[in-house]
């Protein structure tokens, strides 16, 4: 028993140590805040004095005749209170910041200008007064805009300190600190719903970043219009906006605001200048987004207007490439010059690597001592250093090192504690979590053995012991979002965040052996040769199979256009294998998510010892029951909650289609694609889960992976990038070889700001993997500069738009890196080796699905449509014969056509004579699949014929094409692929229209109501129309004292007797109800939502999915004793609630009156534990709630 529970106990010990570390860091930050308050007070005093002197000087200058006596300075005008902070910002002595920031070579006037440019917390009644001659004028509108656009953050002040910011950033943090957000998220193990509130302009910018390169293979569409017109492109401000952001935030050409791995988890990285630039150059947020076919038609019209397809596209590619290279060179020059002048904030933090087995030894020692939950000693003393600028970085490194080591230890401890392990605990009874509340005094640890509690769960007493009424004797399936680990002196138990994780929902017969629990356990086992299952993917994907890699390597060897047909066949085979693999990985369910990611604490409950052999029908029933519960959970990264209301339970074909739709959405707009895949349950809603998905799954454009990871506007994207680089090992590798490995997975190109963000994350990881290499340099930031220079060298050396005589030579490369290592030069042999290796082999990304499309496009002559797009995927290639008249016989050889079917396009080609042309195919026509209809025909002339009808753009006419095949097998395969592709593109367009309607109606501001009704998943199958039938949710702006809106229990009754007693389901709610406020006392007359469709009956066993650890709360024995009555009351409350209601709507049980039961209040928020690379200090209210009186109970 102790061996099975060793890993959870060890994880609890690590979490306990982490809590102590975070508390010490909080005390350090609290002390720093006190110093900031003192400096702020002194600043106010100096401001008042300075203002008084300034007013006095003004009065002396405007003095009337000399005979008059000027007014004494002791009686100033009322104006000193008007602009005191502004004058203080202009006249602040630099020595006041001597302990906070290092000395800067900039003149005092520049400091004054920086401080003055920051927004002031001035009330609305302030009036602008004349400024002194040396002050820079600031418009009042700019101040108001900056004050309005800056979002509140829990790390605004601490982030400015931890980054060694310039006086501008310091003044921004000191003068205008805002109330912090009290909702602290566990980014590593259990993130809750995203609480960042961002301006509409920044939302639009983040959405448009991923879509600006969707047409033309990474080239902005509107650049075509700028070729001949000579006007700036509509996308040019997007590339220039980051430069404006840097110049606004750091007038002295300071680099990125990141300081090592501890970035401030603040959504305010978008500065007012960036928001203003984007708002002035981008359309309104309510503007309708065109479909792909309309966008392609728009590009076609632009090309026709500006010189034709070839001329305009060649010019656009030249302009785009030159502009991006110019931006990269400009950024590199700025960073290099800043580093030479010692004005660059420290980006890379050099940290010592802790021994990997230290934590495990400490944990084992603590376990041998009887689980004495005393705080483990810290690596370093977190006491306040004498000088902030000299010692805070060391504390940052120590804290980050401890957090990362603990995170890895928690990973190792939780990875082996899976559903399979917990199911093995039970030999003849259920795993009852609530029995840990009644342990025996002589046994330490967890007492969950079912044998000791079998008398209590006997016939007639199993339901009464849990507080369940007799009417609910069926199996009660529950799914948890939040789980709390309660720690007493010698006893540990697991419960939900509201009351209790109930697993004692057993039937009357515990000795009855059935096959469903065994099937459920077998479904959760993560084996390599698992069959395709029916559970949609909450997967953590395995690496691609060897067959897929072999096919891909074979396709890579086919480089000549003459073998384009072989390339197509291999591409189609690879796509088929990838689809099957995606379906297999999708069927692994929540076990793979919990076991592989180590992000979710999984436990299971079974009623009896399962039989070894089980039928497939019972296995499918159990899988569907588990699937209905798991997919009904709310999701973390649902920016558009309306799209996450209806989890999809479908057949294998529809599940594959939805997965491909998610891949297409990612390749069009990465943020929307990730949102869709998370909402459908294909990937976990955690940064590490998304990172594994991006690294291991096929079908993703590497260009769009770089676009997603390089987006620094969203905190989730930055966390995913940190997790991605943490998955890569650069140990004992040269810098250019490590960068080659990084570039193989992520295409480092695009906007200069995104490239800089990717290189910065790579450099940080390289320094962590090679500390001995970094020690050879004077400054760890030299790694970042050198990596940036390598990217520039690779772009310059292999760009077709740069003439050979203008390419970068070795001496130019050495000259660019002169003096970047704190004034010293990088060793010449190192630079020469890097140059020679880049010259021999280009840095390029691995092949993806776009590679096959590009090879086909290069083998076609006269191609008028751009095929190489990130979202376009080759489905199949068939040899058909075009029929001009179905009623006449014709020679088939004269009309042979090669039909290439893509996921959104049908391209018709004919073979070229090999003697006349080096190309393989000649372009005939291309038709879109959206709106296409087809039917098969057979007559005396053509036995296997098909008619395709596609609508012509701009008219009601249709283009009709007739084809025939030689055999029925080839035609049948082509028809199946065509039918599925048409359904895929049609569903994708419906999803786009649905999102646009929701955006136009303003439903983005609403969140999903917990008690919203869920339609029939088998009938709706996740289509956009199913989302309209879901209940509208309550507003997302909840009280900051609540932890989240997701910590509710979702119950699903699976009992045939209960289903008969319930009768017909209630009528469904209206399609678009108004948003309902939370109702503390629901009316019994309110219309009940329809229950979930009941699957086939299951045994009285219970399967519990404890998805994530959110809180660690220390409870003593008295607190635990006071909680037991409340837990029993909460158990009866959940048992009487409806199967699909997560709110407070009561359910009338069979023969029982309606009762209004109040739920217990939510627990206090968790300790602030974020991703290992970040730290988010708690607010003042959080400190009072959690730490004012020591340990708190759940109630």
Swiss-Prot record:
Residues 523-532 have a biased composition (Acidic residues). Residues 80-93, 553-574, 598-615 have a biased composition (Low complexity). GO terms for molecular function: guanyl-nucleotide exchange factor activity. Residues 854-987 form the PH domain. The modification Phosphoserine is found at residue 256. Residues 648-841 form the SEC7 domain. Residues 1026-1037 have a biased composition (Basic and acidic residues). Residues 123-134 have a biased composition (Polar residues). Transmembrane segments: none annotated. Disulfide bonds: none annotated. One of its GO terms (cellular component) is inhibitory synapse. CDD domains: bZIP, PH_IQSEC, Sec7. Interacts with DLG1 and DLG4. Interacts with GPHN. This is IQ motif and SEC7 domain-containing protein 3. It comes from Mus musculus (Mouse). The lineage of its organism: Eukaryota, Metazoa, Chordata, Craniata, Vertebrata.
